[in-house]
C-alpha cells in the first residue's frame, strides 16, 4: 500500500481511539449536541478502522509466511507458499476496500433535492418530453421509497410541461440524482408528424441539494420582492378563493422562484425560500465545481446545465449517456423508472475518477 494511504489510515486510527475515549467521557455524555456529533463521526470511522485492523493482521501473516519460505523443511516451505498467495490476495481485496472507504464524501449526498425540468428546443414536443422525464423520475422515486411533491408547474399546450419543479425527500436523494443535471435530448416521431420524420427536441434538468439551516445562505429581506397570486391547477376549488401562491424575486441576481401547491401561503413561502437558498448555493458552488472538473478532466460531475448529457432515441429503443459512452437498448424500462441502469455506471465512473485522484 502507498505510504500516503498508510499515513491517512494511521491518522484515522488515532482519531478512532480518541473518539472511543470521548464517547466514554461523562462531560461529553451530558452534552447531547457533542455526543451526537461524536457518535456520527464514530459510526463513519469505525468500519474503516476495522478494515485497517484486518489489513494489518493479514500483513503480519504475510510477513510470517514469507519468513517460512527460507525454512529448511520442504513441507513447511510448501505450506508457506500457499499462505503467501492467500495473504497477498486478501491484502489486494482489503486495500481496494480501504481506498474506496477513504474517498472524499460529498456532504450533500444525503440531502433532499429540488428537481427542475424545463422544455428547451422543440416546442410542444419538448414539453411532452418534459412530462416523460418527470414521470421517469417520479417512478424512480417511488421505487426508492422517496417522497416527491410538486412545487410549481406550467403545463404544455398539448401535454407535458413547459416547466415543472418538484421537491424530492428521502435517503441519499442527491447522492443518486446529482449527475442528472444537464441537457436531455429526445429523438422520435411526434404524434402530429404525418410523414414519419424523426424530430429532435431537448429539455434541461437541474438537481439542486436542499440546504439545511446551517448551510443555508443568509438572505437579506431587502433583496426580495414577494408577490402573492391565486394558484391555478392542482388544489381543487380552494385555489380560486385565496391568494395562496407565492412568487419571490431575488433582486441582486434576478432569480425567481414560485410555489403554489400548498393551500397555506405560509407553507408556500417557506418552500419558496428553501428553493431560493438552494439556487443561490448552487450559483456559488457551480463555478468552483466547473474549475475542478476542468482541471481534473472529470468524465462526469461538471453539472453544466447546457451540456448535452443524454439522448433518448425512440426508433432504436436506445438511451446513450454521452459522458461515459454508455449505450443501453432498454428505453422503455428506463423511462418507466429504471433510470438506475444509467445512474449506477455514472456513479461507478465517478468513483473510479476519485480513486485515480486519491492515488496521485
Curated annotation (Swiss-Prot):
Q: How is it modified after translation?
A: Methylated by PrmC. Methylation increases the termination efficiency of RF1.
Coiled-coil positions are: none
What pairs make up the disulfide bonds? none
UniProt modified residues of type N5-methylglutamine: 237
One molecular function GO term is: translation release factor activity, codon specific
Q: Give any Gene Ontology cellular component.
A: cytoplasm
Pfam families for the chain: PCRF, RF-1
Q: Which cellular compartments is it found in?
A: Cytoplasm
List the PROSITE patterns.
RF_PROK_I (PS00745)
Cytoplasm in keyword set: yes
Q: Which domain of life is it from?
A: Bacteria
Role: Peptide chain release factor 1 directs the termination of translation in response to the peptide chain termination codons UAG and UAA.
What's the name of the protein? Peptide chain release factor 1
